[in-house]
Structure formats: structure tokens, C-alpha cells
Swiss-Prot record:
UniProt superkingdom: Bacteria
Key words of the record: Glycosyltransferase, Metal-binding, Queuosine biosynthesis, Transferase, tRNA processing, Zinc
Function: Catalyzes the base-exchange of a guanine (G) residue with the queuine precursor 7-aminomethyl-7-deazaguanine (PreQ1) at position 34 (anticodon wobble position) in tRNAs with GU(N) anticodons (tRNA-Asp, -Asn, -His and -Tyr). Catalysis occurs through a double-displacement mechanism. The nucleophile active site attacks the C1' of nucleotide 34 to detach the guanine base from the RNA, forming a covalent enzyme-RNA intermediate. The proton acceptor active site deprotonates the incoming PreQ1, allowing a nucleophilic attack on the C1' of the ribose to form the product.
EC class (word): transferase
Positions annotated to bind substrate: D93, S94, G95, G96, F97, D147, Q191, G218
GO molecular function (one): metal ion binding
Source organism phylogeny: Bacteria, Pseudomonadati, Pseudomonadota, Gammaproteobacteria, Pasteurellales
Cofactor binding comment, as recorded: Binds 1 zinc ion per subunit.
Cofactor dependency: Zn(2+)
Active site: D93 (proton acceptor), D268 (nucleophile)
Gene designation: tgt
InterPro entries: ArchSynthase1/Queuine_TRR (IPR050076), TGT (IPR004803), TGT-like_sf (IPR036511), tRNA_ribo_trans-like (IPR002616)
EC number: 2.4.2.29
UniProt family annotation: Belongs to the queuine tRNA-ribosyltransferase family.
Name of this chain's protein: Queuine tRNA-ribosyltransferase
Organism of origin: Mannheimia succiniciproducens (strain KCTC 0769BP / MBEL55E)
Length: 379
């Protein structure tokens, strides 16, 4: 993987990731949004449909794919790209977040995490080394280190111990990744909770270990938006300017805009797909809750500014009808729209950065939503 920083507008960055895959060279324009394909599928969508929304890279979930179908099945197909028939780049998370979200079902030790398999109840163990091995079998183009996602709220002492263990795990991840002869990219993950001092230590140590890109982890876990913005604004300038920066698990459209304002290049979130299945649809000036009875007779398209298949062919009334009847097509059409909305947003962001008018774009974005622009700490 190579990263080229093309231009900036304030702290916002316009770049390009390039990947050499067996099928040829693929580029990912940044800032980029990655749809989430937890079980080797973006729910309800074929790879061709996902690509048609503008997606250039997907996220796969190491933890869930390890439990089902498992490494052996993956190896029989070749890798995750062959298994799901998406031959463009894939980033996989390390499984850490899913393990830590199991709560009482897991026990953290220096070696790794022992936990109860949520599918069949058996006791299993996931370590930094094992995570690297699973992601190697998945053929991930971007591999994430195994870390502990520090919960919120956390005391300074807990956040410090957690961050220090994540650094030790980062080194073990790096070592096993190299031992496997993996030629793909490995990203480090900055932890440290809401404490700037800990974030600084984490970033400096990860840079010393050396990674192909750096993620900001442990955010969007319940902390107030102001806290997330503060930590993001503090952390991103600590990271190498010539490496991609990834904000994990975030988020709402305004979160993407705020991340880009603070120098982030990559995002992922289940929000566009999950919200689509629940009838919450993102449009130019906010959200349409398609289950609302006022749409029963509405013959207008979902968003007149959107070029997606759904908006070009169907009315709000039809989408309301499909949802009311529990038709699978409704969830699919909603998903197509929401994913396209996110990709259009990223396209607009990239254009604004290229034209060095990103600040104007931010003002226009919030004006359409009828919301105030969140302040920058250093403004």
C-alpha cells in the first residue's frame, strides 16, 4: 500500500491510497468511507451493488469471520476477497473491539483475551499473534493491530494501564505480522481514553514501532461529542503527515465532516446500513424517517439531489409501503441510498479540499442541516 497526500485545505487532507492486488492496481481516494461487511457481506447487498454506490474499500470483521466460517473455510476459498467476491481492497479490524464488548464473558490477561464463544459457549483465546494469523488468512489489504479498546468512562490509572498493554500488544502484532511475511499494510491504533497525556505517549511509541498508517481508537464509545473532538484535534497532529489516519467506528455524517476538519483520512461505521434497515434515511437536509405515516401518499423521490438507484426510480410512498409490508426490497433500496449518500458526501468533501474551500463547505453543510458549526479548539 502507498499513500500520497495530494493537497490540503486547513487541516483537511486530500489523498490517495494505492494497492497492488492480483487483479491489478486499485486506488482509494481519501477522505474515504468504508462500508462495513461484518460477516463477509454488506447486509443485503451484492459486491457490484456496493461498488455502484462509489465504495472503493470495505471493512471486514476478524472476530466474526474467525468464529464463522473460520480460517479453514477461508483458506479453501483463497481468502476473504475470493470468499465474498469483492476483489478491491479490504481492511479488517483486529477483533479487539468485539472481544471487549463481550463484558463479563471475557477475561483480559497480558497474553491476550480468554472469552466464551457467543455462538456455542466454548472457551477460546485471542492474542495479538492469533489476530495477525487470522487476518493473514483473510488476505486483508490493511491489517489492524490487536489492542484493548479503552472503555468510557475510565480513570486515568485504568486508561494508562490499558494503553501501555495495547503498546506491548502493538509490538507483538508487528513482530508476528513480519514473521508471517505479510506484504500488506499494518496500522497501529492510538489509545489513551480522554487523556491527552496518554494519547501522546501512545502515538509516540507507535511511531517508534513503525506502521503503514495510524488509527485513532477508543472514541465514539459513549463520550460527549466535545470530548471526541478535543481528543481528535489533539491526536491527529501527532501522527506522521505522510501516513493515512483512520478514525475507527465513526459515524454520523457530521462526525465524518468533523473528522476531516481535524485531519482524518479514513472512516467506517455500520450507521448507514443499520439505519437503512430501520427506516432512517440520510438526505441533503437531514433525515427522513420513512416509517412516518406522512410519507404514505408522498410521490416525491427520497432526495431530489441524490443520483442513487433508489432516488432515480422510486418514491417515498413506495419505500413507505415496502417498509410497512416488511418487504426485503425496502431494506435493500434504503441501504443503496444511505451508502450512496455517504459516498456522495465524501466526494463533495474531496472536491471542496481540492478547491481549497473546505471551510465554506462545512458552513454550507451545517446550514442545510439547520445546525450550528461545532467550534474548533484552536480556532
Amino acid at each position: 500500500m502507498k499513500f500520497k497526500l495530494k493537497t490540503t485545505s486547513g487541516a483537511a487532507r486530500r489523498g490517495e491510497l494505492t494497492f497492488n492486488r492480483p487483479q491489478g492496481e486499485f486506488s482509494v481516494q481519501t477522505p474515504a468511507f468504508m462500508p462495513v461487511g461484518t460477516y463477509g457481506t454488506v447486509k443485503g447487498m451484492t459486491p457490484e451493488e456496493v461498488r455502484a454506490t462509489g465504495a472503493e474499500i470495505l471493512l471486514g470483521n476478524t472476530f466474526h469471520l474467525w468464529l464463522r466460517p473460520g480460517q479453514e473455510v477461508m483458506r479453501k476459498h483463497g481468502d476473504l476477497h475470493d470468499f465474498m467476491q469483492w476483489h478491491r481492497p479490504i481492511l479488517t479490524d483486529s477483533g479487539g473491539f468485539q472481544v471487549f464488548s463481550l463484558g463479563k464473558l471475557r477475561k483480559i490477561t497480558e497474553e491476550g483475551v480468554k472469552f466464551q464463544n457467543p455462538i456455542n459457549g466454548e472457551r477460546i483465546f485471542l492474542s495479538p499473534e492469533k489476530s495477525m494469523e487470522i487476518q493473514y488468512d483473510l488476505g486483508s489489504d490493511i491489517v489492524m493491530i490487536f489492542d484493548e479498546c479503552t472503555p468510557y468512562p475510565a480513570t486515568f490509572d485504568y486508561a494508562k494501564k490499558s494503553m501501555e498493554m495495547s503498546l506491548r500488544w502493538a509490538k507483538r502484532s508487528r513482530d508476528r505480522f513480519d514473521e508471517l511475511g505479510n506484504k500488506n499494510a499494518l496500522f497501529g491504533i492510538v489509545q489513551g481514553g480522554t487523556f491527552e497525556e496518554l494519547r501522546k505517549v501512545s502515538a509516540e511509541n507507535l511511531i517508534n514501532i513503525g506502521f503503514d498508517g495510524y488509527a485513532v481508537g477508543g472514541l465514539a464509545v459513549g463520550e460527549p461529542k466535545e470530548e471526541m473532538h478535543r481528543i481528535l484535534e489533539f491526536t491527529t497532529p501527532l501522527l506522521p503527515a505522510d501516513k493515512p489516519r483512520y478514525l475507527m467506528g465513526v459515524g454520523k455524517p457530521e462526525d465524518l465532516v468533523e473528522g476531516v476538519r481535524r485531519g482524518i483520512d479514513m472512516f467506517d461505521c455500520v450507521m448507514p446500513t443499520r439505519n437503512a434497515r430501520n427506516g432512517h434515511l440520510f438526505v441533503t437536509d437531514g433525515i427522513v424517517k420513512i416509517r412516518n405515516a406522512k410519507y404514505k401518499d408522498d410521490t416525491s423521490p427520497l432526495d431530489p439531489h441524490c443520483d442513487c438507484y433508489t432516488c432515480q426510480h422510486y418514491t417515498k410512498s413506495y419505500l413507505y409501503h415496502l417498509d410497512k409490508c416488511g418487504e426485503i426490497l425496502g431494506a435493500r433500496l434504503n441501504t443503496i441510498h444511505n451508502l450512496r449518500y455517504y459516498q456522495r458526501l465524501m466526494e463533495q468533501i474531496r472536491t471542496a479540499i481540492e478547491q481549497d474551500r473546505f471551510d465554506d463547505f462545512v458552513q454550507e453543510f451545517y446550514a442545510r442541516m439547520d445546525k450550528p458549526v461545532p467550534p474548533l479548539q484552536k480556532a
